[in-house]
Amino acid sequence: MVEISWNAMAVLLSILFNWGLQNPDAILYGDNVSSLWCMSVNVYHEARGETRTEQIAVSQVVLNRVADPRWPDTPCKVITQNQQFSWYWDTRSDQIHDLRTFRENIYAALLVYTDRTDDVVKGATHYYAHDIIDPPPWGKNMTVANKLGGHT
Protein backbone atom coordinates (compact mmCIF):
# COMPACT_ATOMS: atom_id res chain seq x y z
CA MET A 1 0.00 0.00 0.00
CA VAL A 2 1.08 3.58 -0.59
CA GLU A 3 1.72 4.97 2.88
CA ILE A 4 0.91 8.51 3.97
CA SER A 5 3.33 10.10 6.42
CA TRP A 6 2.17 12.86 8.75
CA ASN A 7 4.36 15.36 6.87
CA ALA A 8 2.81 14.32 3.59
CA MET A 9 -0.67 14.58 5.08
CA ALA A 10 0.12 18.12 6.24
CA VAL A 11 1.23 19.05 2.71
CA LEU A 12 -1.93 17.55 1.23
CA LEU A 13 -4.22 19.31 3.70
CA SER A 14 -2.52 22.67 3.24
CA ILE A 15 -2.89 22.36 -0.51
CA LEU A 16 -6.58 21.53 -0.25
CA PHE A 17 -7.24 24.54 1.94
CA ASN A 18 -4.93 26.93 0.07
CA TRP A 19 -6.61 26.20 -3.24
CA GLY A 20 -9.81 27.52 -1.77
CA LEU A 21 -12.00 24.54 -2.52
CA GLN A 22 -15.60 25.38 -1.75
CA ASN A 23 -16.04 22.24 0.31
CA PRO A 24 -12.59 20.83 1.21
CA ASP A 25 -13.97 18.84 4.13
CA ALA A 26 -15.90 16.65 1.67
CA ILE A 27 -12.56 15.35 0.37
CA LEU A 28 -11.33 14.63 3.88
CA TYR A 29 -13.93 11.97 4.71
CA GLY A 30 -13.52 8.23 4.49
CA ASP A 31 -11.23 6.86 1.84
CA ASN A 32 -11.05 10.13 -0.11
CA VAL A 33 -7.74 11.24 1.41
CA SER A 34 -6.12 7.86 0.72
CA SER A 35 -7.51 7.81 -2.81
CA LEU A 36 -6.30 11.31 -3.58
CA TRP A 37 -2.93 10.54 -2.02
CA CYS A 38 -2.46 7.34 -4.06
CA MET A 39 -3.45 9.14 -7.26
CA SER A 40 -1.06 12.02 -6.52
CA VAL A 41 1.88 9.70 -5.81
CA ASN A 42 1.07 7.77 -8.98
CA VAL A 43 1.10 10.98 -11.05
CA TYR A 44 4.41 11.95 -9.45
CA HIS A 45 6.05 8.71 -10.51
CA GLU A 46 4.29 8.21 -13.85
CA ALA A 47 4.12 11.77 -15.23
CA ARG A 48 6.43 13.97 -13.18
CA GLY A 49 7.77 16.77 -15.35
CA GLU A 50 5.10 16.33 -18.01
CA THR A 51 2.30 18.73 -18.89
CA ARG A 52 -0.76 19.18 -16.70
CA THR A 53 -2.84 17.44 -19.39
CA GLU A 54 -0.56 14.40 -19.29
CA GLN A 55 -0.74 14.33 -15.49
CA ILE A 56 -4.53 14.55 -15.69
CA ALA A 57 -4.50 11.67 -18.19
CA VAL A 58 -2.63 9.41 -15.76
CA SER A 59 -5.17 10.16 -13.03
CA GLN A 60 -8.09 9.67 -15.40
CA VAL A 61 -6.89 6.21 -16.43
CA VAL A 62 -6.90 5.23 -12.74
CA LEU A 63 -10.48 6.46 -12.22
CA ASN A 64 -11.61 4.84 -15.48
CA ARG A 65 -10.34 1.56 -14.09
CA VAL A 66 -12.15 2.14 -10.80
CA ALA A 67 -15.38 2.61 -12.78
CA ASP A 68 -14.79 -0.60 -14.78
CA PRO A 69 -15.90 -3.84 -13.05
CA ARG A 70 -12.83 -5.67 -14.40
CA TRP A 71 -10.61 -3.63 -12.07
CA PRO A 72 -10.45 -3.01 -8.30
CA ASP A 73 -12.90 -0.50 -6.84
CA THR A 74 -10.55 2.12 -5.36
CA PRO A 75 -7.66 4.16 -6.79
CA CYS A 76 -5.20 2.70 -4.26
CA LYS A 77 -6.16 -0.88 -5.16
CA VAL A 78 -5.89 -0.11 -8.89
CA ILE A 79 -2.46 1.49 -8.50
CA THR A 80 -1.04 -1.25 -6.28
CA GLN A 81 -2.52 -4.13 -8.28
CA ASN A 82 0.11 -6.61 -9.39
CA GLN A 83 2.37 -5.26 -12.16
CA GLN A 84 0.11 -2.39 -13.24
CA PHE A 85 2.24 0.69 -12.59
CA SER A 86 5.97 0.13 -12.96
CA TRP A 87 7.10 2.57 -10.26
CA TYR A 88 5.23 0.59 -7.61
CA TRP A 89 6.83 -2.72 -8.59
CA ASP A 90 10.39 -1.73 -9.46
CA THR A 91 13.18 -1.86 -6.89
CA ARG A 92 13.86 1.89 -6.87
CA SER A 93 12.90 4.20 -4.02
CA ASP A 94 9.38 5.61 -4.09
CA GLN A 95 10.38 8.65 -2.03
CA ILE A 96 9.05 12.01 -3.14
CA HIS A 97 12.00 14.36 -3.39
CA ASP A 98 10.58 17.33 -5.28
CA LEU A 99 7.74 18.86 -3.24
CA ARG A 100 7.15 21.71 -5.69
CA THR A 101 6.50 19.22 -8.48
CA PHE A 102 4.47 17.04 -6.13
CA ARG A 103 2.16 19.96 -5.33
CA GLU A 104 1.40 20.20 -9.07
CA ASN A 105 0.81 16.45 -9.19
CA ILE A 106 -1.65 16.69 -6.31
CA TYR A 107 -3.49 19.44 -8.16
CA ALA A 108 -3.77 17.32 -11.33
CA ALA A 109 -5.07 14.35 -9.32
CA LEU A 110 -7.48 16.63 -7.46
CA LEU A 111 -8.94 18.00 -10.70
CA VAL A 112 -9.73 14.48 -11.86
CA TYR A 113 -10.84 13.14 -8.48
CA THR A 114 -13.31 16.00 -7.99
CA ASP A 115 -14.54 15.73 -11.60
CA ARG A 116 -13.34 19.22 -12.61
CA THR A 117 -11.87 18.22 -15.96
CA ASP A 118 -12.87 16.36 -19.10
CA ASP A 119 -11.80 12.77 -19.65
CA VAL A 120 -8.80 13.52 -21.89
CA VAL A 121 -8.18 9.78 -22.39
CA LYS A 122 -11.71 9.14 -23.68
CA GLY A 123 -12.49 6.27 -21.31
CA ALA A 124 -9.13 4.51 -21.71
CA THR A 125 -8.03 2.12 -18.97
CA HIS A 126 -4.46 1.68 -20.19
CA TYR A 127 -1.52 3.78 -21.31
CA TYR A 128 2.15 3.30 -21.93
CA ALA A 129 5.24 5.42 -22.45
CA HIS A 130 5.80 5.04 -26.18
CA ASP A 131 9.40 6.24 -25.96
CA ILE A 132 10.17 3.16 -23.82
CA ILE A 133 8.09 0.50 -25.57
CA ASP A 134 5.80 0.88 -28.58
CA PRO A 135 3.47 -0.88 -28.12
CA PRO A 136 3.81 -3.22 -25.16
CA PRO A 137 2.71 -6.83 -25.74
CA TRP A 138 -0.59 -6.26 -23.91
CA GLY A 139 -1.43 -3.26 -26.13
CA LYS A 140 -1.02 -4.75 -29.59
CA ASN A 141 -4.76 -5.38 -30.07
CA MET A 142 -6.00 -2.21 -28.37
CA THR A 143 -7.34 0.90 -30.07
CA VAL A 144 -5.39 4.09 -29.38
CA ALA A 145 -7.72 6.61 -27.72
CA ASN A 146 -5.24 9.48 -27.56
CA LYS A 147 -1.55 10.38 -27.61
CA LEU A 148 -0.44 12.92 -25.05
CA GLY A 149 3.24 13.79 -24.92
CA GLY A 150 5.18 10.65 -24.06
CA HIS A 151 2.11 8.51 -23.37
CA THR A 152 -0.25 6.60 -25.67
Regions found by a protein language model. Give the residues of each.
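Hydrophobic membrane-insertion alpha-helices, especially the h-region
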Residues: 7-18
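Position-driven detector of the extreme protein N-terminus
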Residues: 2, 10, 143-145
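Catalytic phosphate/metal-binding cores of nucleic-acid and nucleotide-processing enzymes, i.e., regions
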Residues: 2-8, 24-26
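Bacterial extracytoplasmic/cell-wall-associated proteins, especially those involved in peptidoglycan
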Residues: 17-152
